[in-house]
């Protein structure tokens, strides 16, 4: 796949050309997407992998983010301690939990897809961006971030005055 669309966002997955067709209220628009070889950066452990695990609930206190983890797998609570998570995710070389030799056999992918029993239930779908992030990080060799990797230094939410829902608009768009 060149790109995937999830929740309205187009995410580059591999070099190539794709066409995206969007329809809303009977109106259609077509967008041509070109992903070049240099446009697919390595998956970031800090900025992508850890947030995926947090978003899926894996690093919550009720799951692997608890002080002792679950099932021998421990993550820091909500991804707070990158060194703990890095040790857990990268420390088992040639292990079954995260296998660079056969990424699809990694328990990090198989359990949340429910390919093997998982007490936490299904947390991923094979066509989701979250699954692609985790799988591609493993395929790329479970690399840690370089010293020059981008870091989030601030976050601004718009509108700045906060939530402004009205009865006619039950959802609020934040940018």
Predicted features, each with a name:
Residues 1-175:
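Aromatic- and Gly/Pro-enriched helix-to-coil junctions and flexible linker segments
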């Amino acid at each position: 796949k060149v790109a995937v669309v999830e929740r309205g966002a187009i995410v580059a997955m591999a070099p190539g050309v794709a066409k995206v067709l969007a329809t809303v209220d009977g109106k259609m628009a077509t967008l041509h997407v070109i992903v070049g070889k240099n446009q697919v950066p390595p998956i970031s452990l800090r900025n992508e992998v850890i947030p995926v695990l947090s978003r899926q609930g894996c690093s919550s206190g009720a799951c692997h983010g608890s002080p002792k983890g679950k099932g021998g797998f421990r993550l820091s609570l909500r991804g707070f301690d990158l060194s703990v998570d890095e040790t857990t995710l990268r420390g088992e070389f040639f292990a079954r939990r995260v296998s660079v030799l056969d990424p699809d056999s990694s328990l990090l992918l198989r359990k949340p897809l429910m390919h093997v029993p998982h007490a936490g239930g299904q947390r991923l779908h094979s066509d989701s961006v979250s699954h692609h992030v985790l799988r591609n990080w493993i395929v790329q060799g479970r690399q840690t971030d370089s010293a020059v990797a981008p870091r989030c230094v601030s976050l601004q939410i718009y509108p700045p005055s906060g939530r402004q829902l009205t009865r006619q608009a039950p959802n609020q768009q934040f940018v």
